[in-house]
């Protein structure tokens, strides 16, 4: 059995989708192994990078698969890959015990569509499994308090890097 410390990180992307008012999209997760309490169930879209896929293409794909959104303009990306470890108590259940956490490339995207484009209940016209049960626009500076605690340092860095793009 592989020791927790020796497990690799899952390569992923994260998306800060910013609307014309400078607010950021967050989705309410339906629960699962990361669930801590009802105050920490909100997150920005994120997901894995497929083999042979570059991070930018993965970001657009994941955003569509989770929200149905295609109307975006790329504003920025964080140069570094940001990492977080999942708690040891759930490491064996998350991703079938193959990873200790995620290494994420983060993108800031301007949402150029209308709210009617967003569909978290039947993303991609129902082709993709719903990851969120609801969504809202939120001031960027609030995001670290809404995420599960073990992802908080990543969200703090994302806010620091992208705050000016949201006008805050």
UniProtKB/Swiss-Prot annotation:
GO biological process: nucleoside phosphate metabolic process; ribose phosphate metabolic process
A Pfam family that the UniProt record links to this protein: NUDIX
Keyword Hydrolase listed: yes
Cofactor(s) demanded: a divalent metal cation
Start and end residues of each Nudix hydrolase domain: 8-160
Superkingdom, natural source: Bacteria
Function as written in the Swiss-Prot or TrEMBL entry: Accelerates the degradation of transcripts by removing pyrophosphate from the 5'-end of triphosphorylated RNA, leading to a more labile monophosphorylated state that can stimulate subsequent ribonuclease cleavage.
Protein family according to the UniProt entry: Belongs to the Nudix hydrolase family. RppH subfamily.
Protein name: RNA pyrophosphohydrolase
Organism, scientific name: Bradyrhizobium sp. (strain BTAi1 / ATCC BAA-1182)
Species classification: Bacteria, Pseudomonadati, Pseudomonadota, Alphaproteobacteria, Hyphomicrobiales
């Amino acid at each position: 059995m592989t020791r927790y410390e020796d497990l690799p990180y899952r390569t992923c992307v994260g998306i800060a989708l910013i609307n014309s008012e400078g607010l950021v999209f967050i989705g309410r997760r339906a629960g699962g192994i990361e669930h801590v309490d009802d105050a920490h169930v909100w997150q920005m879209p994120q997901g894995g990078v497929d083999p042979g896929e570059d991070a930018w293409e993965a970001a657009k794909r994941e955003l569509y698969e989770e929200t149905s959104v295609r109307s975006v303009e790329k504003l920025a990306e964080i140069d570094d890959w940001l990492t977080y470890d999942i708690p040891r108590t759930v490491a064996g259940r998350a991703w079938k015990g193959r990873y200790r956490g995620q290494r994420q490339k983060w993108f800031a995207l301007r949402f150029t569509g209308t709210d009617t484009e967003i569909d978290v209940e039947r993303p991609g016209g129902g082709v993709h499994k719903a990851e969120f049960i609801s969504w809202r626009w939120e001031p960027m500076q609030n995001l670290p308090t809404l995420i599960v605690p073990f992802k908080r340092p990543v969200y703090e860095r994302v806010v620091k890097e992208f705050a000016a793009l949201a006008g805050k």
